[in-house]
């Protein structure tokens, strides 16, 4: 562990120590203020809960699972004791708790939970590691080709490992093993280039593939719930893949320019990867079974609405059931349950509940009206709206360590903002999907995403190295959003 990290843990910052109490104080102030005109009491209180959530998530003053529990209680009590304008009576804590638990009954929640099991199966069998090593064994020993291999690993794994942190957790030990086997210093530009790329390419392909990240499921759920449109895996891929491919190419060029490796070719590099692959032995029966089930699942994802009507969540649940069955499966409940990050699952469910409550109490609509008014968006062109909202999301993400939390708080408001626009021909579904891509832009700081922190923990680069890659990468991403918004996405009818 880094000395800096250990020091920070020993002496947490002011917001880390007092963020929870500040969040409670801000919540109390908001709730005690007079309810604004056009906003219900329940909506007023939900804005307070949302601000509380943003503060505790941004400061990580309390852990995400604990914050999820606190948010559930706040929704149950504050909404429960608010008057229901439709009936003239209080909502009641039972109805409030129902709002707090709504996210746990969504199909998106089932998909995220199932994805955790799929990621655990990949880790248990070692199939993800084998895939990564096979790719790296084919690219050669030149420094630039090793970098290309890391990018290809991130791309391929995003299809099969539907967990951001699981993909990075798979790649980091492999890349670290390669760095040590190559005899390259940990603080070399080559080592830093590879490890930063591991994190950044993961964020890039979070955009490209619907099932690659939990925050995508947040947006898909709200689009379905609010707008009645179900976005298939293929719909998402066709729209987002060009962006991710162009970003991957930009990442490759950028990393070679910013952190040019000290060596052109690694002596014995190819032999090292081959040795690591040989140490794994022949592909096991469990790996084969998982590979077949994963390929079948990928087939069902890509052909949804084309060859069949089975949605992504249902097909994933079927796959997980097969993986848990005797003889057919590759894992047992007792050994798998402890490998699942249940905190992430709970946070996701509560995030959906928070957004749903903002929508049902009309708090999101009221906030949207304020945003439209402040930024004069009502009659702006779609590209201007896209530019302003993209910059807004990039800036606000600087304070977040969880893209899932950011999506939960902001996507309902974005949908409401887009619904308020009077610009003719605005595609609310398409614009929401594109702005969800921006939610995954955790490129600038290590603390902006869990995958960044995993890579940072290897001690192969400094914060300023990450920032040097993150700022230009973010600017390129913004430029691509605007370019595709004016061309490809416009031709598709998304903008």
Predicted regions, residues:
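Structural signature of hydrophobic alpha-helical transmembrane segments
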Residues: 39-48, 105-114, 167, 311-320, ...
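Helical membrane-embedded segments and adjacent short helical loop/helix-boundary regions
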Residues: 14-23, 41-46, 59-68, 98-116, ...
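Lipid-exposed faces of alpha-helical membrane segments in multi-pass integral membrane proteins
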Residues: 18, 22-29, 48-55, 70, ...
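Flexible hinge motifs at transmembrane-helix junctions and intramembrane kinks/re-entrant loops
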Residues: 36-44, 51-70, 253-257, 283-288, ...
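Membrane-embedded alpha-helical segments and adjacent helix-loop junctions characteristic
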Residues: 8, 35, 66, 70-185, ...
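Alpha-helical transmembrane segments of multi-pass membrane proteins
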Residues: 112, 144-158, 184-206, 231-236, ...
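Juxtamembrane and boundary regions of transmembrane helices in multi-pass small-molecule transporters
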Residues: 2-34, 124-127, 164-167, 184-282, ...
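Central hydrophobic cores of alpha-helical transmembrane segments in multi-pass inner-membrane proteins
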Residues: 27-30, 47-57, 72-81, 111-117, ...
